[in-house]
Every structure is written in structure tokens, then in C-alpha cells.
């Protein structure tokens, strides 16, 4: 009777979330751990050989009925009925019910099973049957404790109240929220589909340095580290671009890399300082080829990962089937903001026009024409681009690595892809003129000296590489995390990164 009251107290404590109650429950579980060892039972077992998974049994009942099986998993629920107990155990494929009966396992084992807690991991040997309620179940003949859980699983894990804790303790989130696990399984499918697509197109996957002497390839503030043996500062890469283009100089014609980038910037629903990018380069191609490749790749990935190009994101239906609209940047601004930057060719004129338009956009008097154009676009146009849209022909001031347009040198052969008001991809016809490239780098250096910490640094070795001759090429970067957000209907980038960066608790 005393033992029963103790277990009732344990269940009562488990239902509450107070810290003192949690500590008491953990104390009770540690007592159970000690009891197991006193009985000569090792609560943290070694290798355990299963014959089947939960999903296989559930999907193949006709084949599996009355057959012997050995399964393993975590106890997720339990209900006792005197001389018999039903429980659900969860493995990597799903949950299945087990039936433990006193007459089948014996008094000692049945008493031991009654002392197990939700969260404990066990192995079960038995046979498959279906209950009167129609649930596929494994009737246990024996079981083995594989791992004793000392912390109770939270009962109320859903909802915004627990969202930060879910990110901090993703391991618990994955246990109790199957839909979260599905997101990361889909993420894996998406990345695999990207590789399959590019491999099929003849691209070669490569790896380039994560620590760089000079960070380049993007406008971003880098993380700095120090190499003790060489006594020199290094930068975590903000992009692999300049190294991948060095490979084009070396004779590789189609290369890609899927890897991490690091940018010392703010955190939001769209930004994490550590993120995954797909970047690729193709010799003898241009940004039109990259647009064709982008819409073909993303639609193919959607079909391989989800089975369709029609998805729903945050209540909005989005059709990823190509072709996608291709609209010049200045034209989109003219349509949505009423500003004709094509007729405003100086920064002063552009600045004055934006102020008179009453957009409510804060500009810096030092902003260049291209910077003003981009700020207006991001503020007014970007949120309205819901269906997949290529915005093309960006100002040269904000595109230091893109080739100038022959018919208008103030613009470049560059595009960005927007879906649901978010940038998903960035691409251009690559600048392969070493003299023009050096001149643009020098302008970026001037910006850095003026206080712009995100401006590009001079990379003399990259200029040296271009001087050997780089073939004309198209380049493309796709944010894998944002693509996964889109294809899994996830509102925040933290929902698609297993362990997002979190500020430590005090």
C-alpha cells in the first residue's frame, strides 16, 4: 500500500510543472535506479538486436500477425488494469502498443514493469496481435530495461509558452512532438534532392575553406577567430563564392557546395548567425541560365521531397511549378512605389524623390543611388512578392561581384528570387574582368574605411586568379534553411535548424 501511494505521488508530481515538484520526481526516479542496481539489473544496457520497427509492424499486420518480434523504444504512455498493463513505446519510426500480462511475464517481471516510468527505454520480445478495439499490439513475453530516464517528459510542451525551451532542449522536443521530427526528416530529403538534381546535371560537389584569411563573397560582418600556431587572425566564412570561382579558373566547369556560412549579425525569424547555403557555379553560362536552373531545381526538389509543386505556407497557397515571372527591379519599384529611378540617375535626385514620396523610409545622406533603390525595394516591394518571382537587374553599387549590363553599366546581370516576401536565392552573371573587379573592391575598401563593417575587403589573390582568366559563368546561391522553411510550412528559421543559437541563461 505504501508503495502504491508513493507511485500515486510520483504521478501527481509529474502532472505538475513546479521546479520543486520536478526535483522530487527526479529524486524518486533516482531511488528506482538504485533499486534496479540493488537487484542486479543494469539500467543502462548495451547492444540490443531488434527484428522489426514499430512502423513496419503497423504497416504489415497481415504478414506480422502472430509472428514473434523483438522491438525497442521509449515508454510514452502506460495504463494498468490489475494483472495486465497496456503501454505505448516509441522508436525512430513511430509508436506501437505493447501488452504486458502477469501470466505471460511472471510476477517478478510484472512487478518490475510496474516500477518503470514514462521515458524509460526498453526492449520487448513478444508476438503481434490486434486488440478487440482494433489496435495492433505486441504481447510481451519478456522485456529488458535499456535506459532509465531520470527526468520526466513534459506533458505541456506545445504552444508559444514553451517555444524557447523547445529550441534549447531540442532532444526533448523531438521526443514529444512527432511533427518536429518530420520537419527535420523533410529537411534531409530536401538537401538530398538538391544533391541528386545537381549530380544529375553534371555538377561536382566540392569543399572550400571554412576559415579564411580574407572573408568575401557577401556583404556581412564576419566572426573572427585566432590561429595560435600561426599567430594570425582568421575569419569564419561568410560565403564560399570566391573560392568556388577560383575553381572555375582552375578548369572545373560545374561546381557546387552545400555547407555552413557564418555571419555576425542579428537573429530573427529569417536569420541565424550559422546557416546552410547551396552555392553553385557553371562556366559558359549566365544569369538567364541560372534562372532556368533555379526554377527547375526548386520545383524538382519539391516534387522529390513532398510529391507536389503546390504547397501551403502560413495559410497561403504557393505554386512552385515553372516558369516564374522575371521582372526588372526598377520596374517593380515603379509599379509598387510610384518612383521611376530609371529617370533619377543621381543619388541626390533619388534621395529627394524618396523623401517627397512619403514612404517613411529613413535614408542616410551618404547612401548611393543603388543603395537607395535597394532600400525602397526592400521596404515597399519585397513583402508583396508572394508567388515565386525573379527580380532582375540590380544596381552595380550593391552587386560588387556581378557583371555589368552591356546596355546600362549602372545595372548588373543579377537576380534574386522571392517567395512569400522573402529572398530565397541570389544569382548573377559573374564578373570575370579583373580590372573592373579590382576597381569595385577598392570602392568597397573606401566604404569600410568610412565605417561600413559589411563592405567587402580587398582580395588580391582572387584578383590574381582572375588575371589568369576565368570563363564567363553564372553563379547561384540558395538559402537551404529558408527553402526548408517554405517546404515545411515553418514560420521561423529556428524551427528548421536542429540546434539554433541561443543566448545562455544566467
Curated annotation (Swiss-Prot):
Disulfide bonds: none annotated. PROSITE patterns: AA_TRNA_LIGASE_II (PS50862). Binds 3 Mg(2+) ions per subunit. Keywords: Aminoacyl-tRNA synthetase, ATP-binding, Cytoplasm, Ligase, Magnesium, Metal-binding, Nucleotide-binding, Protein biosynthesis. This is Lysine--tRNA ligase. It comes from Pelotomaculum thermopropionicum (strain DSM 13744 / JCM 10971 / SI). GO terms for molecular function: ATP binding; catalytic activity, acting on a protein; lysine-tRNA ligase activity; magnesium ion binding; transferase activity; tRNA binding. Homodimer. Its EC number is 6.1.1.6. Its main location: cytoplasm. SUPFAM superfamilies: Class II aaRS and biotin synthetases, Nucleic acid-binding proteins. Its cofactor is Mg(2+). GO terms for cellular component: cytosol. Mg(2+) 1 binds at residues 416, 423.
Amino acid at each position: 500500500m505504501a508503495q502504491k501511494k508513493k507511485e500515486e505521488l510520483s504521478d501527481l508530481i509529474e502532472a505538475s510543472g513546479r521546479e520543486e515538484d520536478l526535483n522530487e520526481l527526479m529524486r524518486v526516479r533516482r531511488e528506482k535506479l538504485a533499486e534496479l542496481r540493488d537487484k542486479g539489473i543494469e539500467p543502462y544496457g548495451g547492444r540490443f538486436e531488434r527484428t522489426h520497427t514499430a512502423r513496419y509492424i503497423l504497416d504489415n499486420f497481415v504478414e506480422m500477425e502472430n509472428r514473434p518480434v523483438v522491438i525497442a523504444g521509449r515508454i510514452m504512455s502506460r495504463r494498468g488494469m490489475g494483472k495486465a498493463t497496456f503501454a505505448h513505446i516509441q522508436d525512430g519510426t513511430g509508436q506501437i502498443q505493447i501488452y504486458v500480462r502477469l501470466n505471460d511475464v511472471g510476477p517478478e517481471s510484472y512487478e518490475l514493469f510496474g516500477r518503470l516510468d514514462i521515458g524509460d527505454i526498453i526492449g520487448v520480445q513478444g508476438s503481434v496481435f490486434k486488440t478487440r478495439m482494433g489496435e495492433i499490439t505486441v504481447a510481451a513475453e519478456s522485456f529488458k530495461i535499456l535506459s532509465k530516464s531520470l527526468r520526466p517528459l513534459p506533458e505541456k510542451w506545445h504552444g508559444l509558452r514553451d517555444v524557447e525551451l523547445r529550441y534549447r532542449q531540442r532532444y526533448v522536443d523531438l521526443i514529444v512532438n512527432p511533427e518536429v521530427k518530420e520537419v527535420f526528416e523533410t529537411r534531409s530529403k530536401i538537401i538530398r534532392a538538391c544533391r541528386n538534381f545537381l549530380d544529375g546535371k553534371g555538377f561536382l560537389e566540392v569543399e572550400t575553406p571554412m576559415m579564411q584569411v580574407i572573408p568575401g563573397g557577401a556583404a556581412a560582418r564576419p566572426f573572427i577567430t585566432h590561429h595560435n600556431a600561426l599567430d594570425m587572425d582568421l575569419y569564419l566564412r561568410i560565403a564560399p563564392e570566391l573560392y568556388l570561382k577560383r575553381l572555375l579558373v582552375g578548369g572545373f566547369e560545374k561546381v557546387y557546395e552545400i555547407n555552413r556560412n557564418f555571419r555576425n549579425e542579428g537573429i530573427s525569424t529569417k536569420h541565424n548567425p550559422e546557416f546552410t547555403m547551396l552555392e553553385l557555379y557553371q562556366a559558359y553560362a549566365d544569369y538567364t541560365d541560372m534562372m532556368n536552373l533555379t526554377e527547375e531545381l526548386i520545383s524538382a526538389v519539391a516534387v522529390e521531397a513532398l510529391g507536389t509543386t503546390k504547397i501551403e505556407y502560413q495559410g497561403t497557397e504557393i505554386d512552385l511549378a515553372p516558369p516564374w515571372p522575371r521582372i526588372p527591379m526598377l520596374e517593380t519599384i515603379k509599379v509598387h512605389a510610384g518612383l521611376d529611378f530609371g529617370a533619377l540617375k543621381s543619388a541626390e535626385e533619388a534621395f529627394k524623390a524618396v523623401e517627397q514620396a512619403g514612404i517613411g523610409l529613413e535614408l542616410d545622406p551618404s547612401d548611393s543611388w543603388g543603395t537607395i533603390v535597394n532600400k525602397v525595394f526592400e521596404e515597399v516591394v519585397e513583402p508583396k512578392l508572394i508567388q515565386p518571382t525573379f527580380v532582375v537587374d540590380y544596381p552595380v553599387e550593391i552587386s560588387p561581384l556581378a557583371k555589368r549590363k552591356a546596355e546600362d553599366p549602372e545595372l548588373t546581370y543579377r537576380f534574386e528570387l522571392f517567395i512569400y516576401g522573402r529572398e530565397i536565392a541570389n544569382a548573377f552573371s559573374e564578373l570575370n574582368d579583373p580590372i573592373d573587379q579590382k576597381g569595385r573592391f577598392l570602392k568597397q575598401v573606401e566604404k569600410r574605411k568610412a565605417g561600413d563593417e559589411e563592405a567587402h575587403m580587398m582580395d588580391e589573390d582572387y584578383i590574381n586568379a582572375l588575371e589568369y582568366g576565368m570563363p564567363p559563368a553564372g553563379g547561384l546561391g540558395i538559402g537551404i534553411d529558408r527553402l526548408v522553411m517554405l517546404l515545411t510550412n515553418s514560420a521561423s528559421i529556428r524551427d528548421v535548424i536542429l540546434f539554433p543559437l541561443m543566448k545562455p541563461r544566467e
